[in-house]
Amino acid sequence: LEDLGILKGLKILDFSALLPGPMATMIFADLGADVIHVESSKRVDLTRIMPPYDDDHEAYIHQHLNRSKKSITLNLKSPEAIDIVKSLVQEYDVIIEGFRPGVMQRLGIGYEALKEINPKVIYCAITGYGQTGPYSNRPGHDNNYLSLAGLLDYSRHKDKKPVSMGVQLADIAGGTMHAAIGVLAAALHREKTGEGQFIDISMTDAVFSLNAMYGAAFIGGGRVPQPEQEILNGGSYYDFYKTKDGRFFSVGSLEPQFRKLLCEALDIPELIDNTFNDSYYTQIRFKEAVHDAFLSKTYEEWLEVFNEDFEGCVEPVLTFPEACEHPQLKAREMIVTIPKSDGTMQKQIASPFKFDGTQPEYKHVGAKLGEHNEEVLLSLGFNAEQIKALKEKGVLE
């Protein structure tokens, strides 16, 4: 298989940090895009200092999110650094940033300024609340955006507080994925028209749009989604069940044919005739029967029942180490080895994209801070003496 160059020719300057922007540009880099990560050595990306670390004291999280990207360190408060960015934009014409609204403009490298240099520039700004509105300059984090989007309240159990998820839904499903889709849509538009684009990604907007089912039911029909009252939020037997030894299984056997298989496996055949659209009371009675049945056996005993031949939509709740060893994920090669600068290899989560006849491109793990300063500046025509002077002046942090 050839290396995947499906985005070969797409050149990106990534000014973002933490998770939403870097994960988007990681996706692009995996697909063959050329990404330069513009960083500061004074205000280091927190993912660089989040343990655990490898033998070189480099953070594994950062090495994953920033693989295959070049790293340069610029003091964006210096005019020389701004000139370097403007030079790069003539070639690297996709910008991704995650600052609060107005920061890049004040630095002199906002969309309008860069558009003057390169009219084809695609500029994607990822923020918590968007470029407009009363909250546009308000700081926030993943759980804040989910809270304001109306998603968390009906995702909890009755009389229980919302649960913090292990995966940052607003950051990734909201920020990363919508930024990636937006940039690719803008790139297609540019290919047809020659025009660049400003893309305003609000993570709150994006996760608000994820209220697709219950949000549509409320906006169209006035039905307010309630905790543990809906088919998919615990109001039916579509839920998680504890085993005798304290592990859990997920049950999604909603359709009649799957419910039949579930009832047979749990040895409650008398409940097979309960249909999908039964009353809430009947649903709860059935759920209680499922709950009691699961408590009768251990996790390992249920694994023998709900084995790879069972087709009734029941799966064990795996730990992450168990997921890494699951035969399905191993068959899909979802863990790969990626080279480090010292020639050794590091295991990482693979790109999930499977293209016919091609494979993802993993050049190297996330670079050390400023590792590519000289390489990038030499490509812009700077000589060794000029680069040395920029370092001494603090332009290269």
Tell where the protein language model's regions lie, with residue ranges.
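N-terminal helix-loop segment corresponding to the beta1-alpha1 unit
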Residues: 1-182, 186-192, 368, 374-397
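Terminal low-complexity tails and localization/encapsulation signals of metabolic enzymes
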Residues: 1-10, 242-244, 322-397
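Short, well-structured beta-strand/strand-turn elements
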Residues: 35, 308-322, 383-388
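Glycine-rich beta-alpha junction loops
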Residues: 42, 129-130, 203-208, 245-247, ...
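Oxidoreductase and adenylate-handling cofactor-binding alpha/beta cores
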Residues: 149, 175-196, 209, 213-220, ...
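A short glycine-threonine-serine/GTX helix/turn-capping micro-motif
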Residues: 163-174, 196-198, 227-232, 236-238, ...
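Beta-strand segments within the central parallel beta-sheet cores of soluble alpha/beta enzyme folds
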Residues: 196-204, 305, 387-392
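Aromatic-enriched alpha-helical interface/lid elements that frame and gate functional surfaces
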Residues: 237-310, 314
